[in-house]
A protein has these predicted regions:
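A structural "flexibility-hinge" signal
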Residues: 1-213
Length: 213
């Protein structure tokens, strides 16, 4: 199964990056940086939420109804006349539900690394969140995922499946960030390959390679 960053680098993903950048007035490369960091974090947060029966059922319902992937069928129309406020409101609701009280810390950490303020990161994620849910809904349909257990497996697969635990630890660290400088420094070290353990593959290695200069 393709990982979430593979999907982001596909033709569909590039179209999403371009559209989100245009609709938020943000440079495409910075938008790509934000999404490259944010998408695994959102997947990890959803995996956390889906660990409970209630959380899994809630996500299952969302993917079967509103977020079934159909939003991806007409991206030209979605971005053509400017993204509708209802899409942004939907995105804000998704982020609040997925990240809860972790949202501000996540946006601060990603903003620090992408060279954007947290408000700009929030605007990017509001537009991107319904599309991310659409990508997940599309994968759910293609993989014929019907049970909560299968859904957890789908999320794990998008995160890299059997990645070593240290490859996932930086996702936990971002989710638990509160804007504290030391946390941001720790996460920056992981993204930039300063954490040697995360440079050997999996998400940590992929991100280290993308952001290492």
């Amino acid at each position: 199964m393709a990982g979430i960053l593979d999907l982001l680098n596909s033709d569909l993903g590039k179209q999403i990056v371009s559209g989100v950048a245009g609709s938020t007035g943000t440079d495409s490369s910075k938008t790509s940086s934000v999404l490259t960091m944010a998408l695994p974090v959102l997947m990890k947060a959803m995996e956390r939420n889906a660990a409970t029966p209630e959380g899994a059922q809630s996500l299952q319902n969302a993917l079967e109804n509103k977020h079934d992937g159909s939003i991806l069928d007409n991206l030209g129309g979605l971005f053509g006349g400017g993204v509708d406020d209802s899409v942004k409101q939907d995105g804000a609701g998704i982020l609040s539900h997925i990240l809860g009280d972790k949202q501000q810390g996540v946006e601060q950490v990603i903003g620090q690394k992408a060279g954007l303020d947290a408000g700009s990161v929030a605007n990017i994620l509001k537009v991107a969140a319904p599309l991310v849910m659409g990508m997940l809904g599309k994968q759910k349909k293609e993989q014929n995922v019907s049970s909560s257990g299968d859904l957890t497996g789908l999320l794990g697969g998008l995160l890299g499946g059997s990645s070593a635990s240290n490859d996932q630890s930086f996702l936990e660290k971002i989710l638990d960030a509160d804007g504290d400088g030391s946390v941001i420094d720790d996460v920056a070290g992981m993204f930039l390959g300063g954490d040697k353990k995360s440079s050997g593959g999996g998400i940590g290695g992929m991100l280290g390679g993308m952001f290492g200069k």
